[in-house]
């Protein structure tokens, strides 16, 4: 049977879940989390970052203030952990950041880019001398073979790190990869091993169980899988599996209570995998952009997937178009958006348009274009993201289309889709210079087009 001495479990809900809440958590929730985990076979709780002030707002658990750590220490019977971002922290910073928490925090983990392992060793040696356990969270596990001397340098970890974590940053490894990586690391270091999985392909559980079966010493999980992008292995799933498979003693009342406590956040943020995360995981592409695109709900899945395909191909964009040069100018333009008022007032707007033959109509979105078919006035259609698909629907595969299409300047971060039948009528703006914000939005594209037409 598995006991806590055979495999250690680290729950990093507060730290990894902070990517959704900006590291703000309600005190009542944190108190319940601490109370419940006291009753569960979890060894470590990772409760945030320690950092100097960063640009923009980041919540309490990104900085893990001393008063909060003291409160957690008072209430938790578990070992407490914070993590440092190696890219932001140097040896000369650790006395300020870690000195005040000696005796409060048990382990300091360091998030490490494999490219900077040597630099991380210097930082970690200083952390170790302060009396902390040290964990190396080495990212981009699926790409380690691309990092020159990284594997051969692992021998230098032995005397410094207590745990060397294999981090599946992209959520794209399979059990076979886990086994091969464990063997590879073991052949170069005697450090205890850990595994941190992501759930893009819903393999976090099997990958973690595989890691346990092949002798890793510590594994990570989070309540309800709360974590960056597609999320992590669910703590409740891991504990349930180990209870059934290995007889690990689990207090299911306490487990159910803490899972229920996070239901509100799960409903609000809806973390978990979806098609874009599956594609990014399968192709070892960064989750940060995907998380931004998915959570804002501004981009369609087609746009996100096209952007990911461009990343995989290492191209800025999949298509370049001729630059839009306004052959006609218009003292007046009418910009029609995708809202319901453009439908409600279509009849009146059509009468206005007909009364002004020189007026140019700019469709910020093609959503309502069907209501404005057949006009003699020149019409321009802004194609942002997957608007090309919407245009096809509006004009029945574009058999009735008589207009121009304008796209944002090259490169377009979400890639390019232009229906083949209108490609010869499609152009890209040379620039958008009237604003620095939301340059890839429908509104910005429509307004810059109007400016290009010298509209008043």
Each predicted region: which residue ranges?
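Gly/Ser/Thr-rich loops at beta-strand to alpha-helix junctions
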Residues: 113-117, 171, 200-201, 228, ...
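N-terminal glycine-/serine-/threonine-rich phosphate-binding loop
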Residues: 314-360
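Flexible, charged surface loops at secondary-structure boundaries
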Residues: 38-39, 74-76, 101-103, 158, ...
């Amino acid at each position: 049977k598995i006991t806590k001495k055979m495999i250690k479990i680290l729950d990093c809900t507060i730290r990894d879940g902070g990517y959704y809440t900006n590291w703000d958590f309600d005190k009542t929730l944190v108190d319940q989390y601490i109370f419940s985990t006291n009753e569960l076979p979890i060894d470590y709780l990772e409760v945030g970052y320690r950092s100097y002030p960063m640009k923009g707002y980041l919540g309490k658990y990104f900085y893990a203030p001393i008063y909060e750590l003291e409160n957690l220490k008072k209430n938790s019977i578990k070992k407490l952990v914070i993590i440092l971002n190696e890219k932001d922290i140097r040896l000369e910073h650790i006395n300020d950041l870690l000195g005040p928490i000696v005796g409060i925090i048990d382990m300091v983990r360091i998030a490490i880019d494999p490219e900077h392992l040597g630099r991380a060793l210097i930082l970690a040696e200083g952390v170790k001398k302060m009396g902390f356990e040290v964990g190396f969270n080495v990212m981009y596990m699926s790409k380690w073979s691309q990092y020159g001397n990284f594997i051969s340098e692992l021998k230098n970890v032995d005397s410094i790190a207590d745990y060397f974590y294999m981090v599946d940053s992209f959520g794209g490894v399979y059990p076979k990869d886990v086994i091969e990586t464990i063997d590879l690391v073991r052949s170069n270091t005697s450090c205890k091993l850990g595994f941190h999985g992501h759930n893009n392909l819903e393999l976090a559980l099997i990958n973690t169980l595989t890691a346990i079966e092949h002798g890793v010493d510590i594994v990570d999980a989070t309540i309800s899988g709360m974590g960056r992008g597609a999320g992590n292995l669910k703590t409740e799933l891991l504990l349930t599996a180990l209870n059934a498979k290995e007889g690990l003693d689990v207090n299911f009342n306490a487990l159910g209570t803490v899972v229920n406590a996070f239901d509100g956040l799960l409903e609000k943020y809806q973390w978990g995998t979806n098609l874009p995360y599956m594609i990014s995981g399968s192709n070892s592409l960064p989750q940060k952009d995907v998380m931004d695109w998915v959570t804002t709900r501004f981009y369609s899945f087609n746009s996100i997937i096209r952007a990911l395909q461009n990343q995989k191909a290492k191209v800025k964009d999949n298509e370049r178009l001729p630059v839009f040069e306004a052959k006609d100018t218009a003292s007046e333009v009418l910009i029609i958006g995708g809202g319901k008022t453009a439908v409600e007032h279509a009849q009146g707007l059509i009468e206005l348009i007909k009364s002004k033959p020189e007026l140019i109509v700019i469709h910020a979105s093609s959503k309502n274009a069907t209501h404005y078919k057949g006009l003699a006035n020149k019409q321009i259609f802004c194609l942002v993201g997957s608007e090309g698909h919407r245009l096809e629907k509006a004009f029945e595969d574009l058999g009735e289309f008589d207009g121009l299409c304008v796209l944002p300047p090259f490169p377009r971060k979400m890639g390019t889709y232009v229906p083949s039948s209108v490609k010869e009528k499609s152009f890209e703006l040379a620039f958008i210079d009237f604003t620095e914000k939301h340059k890839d939005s429908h509104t910005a594209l429509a307004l810059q087009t109007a400016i290009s037409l010298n509209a008043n």
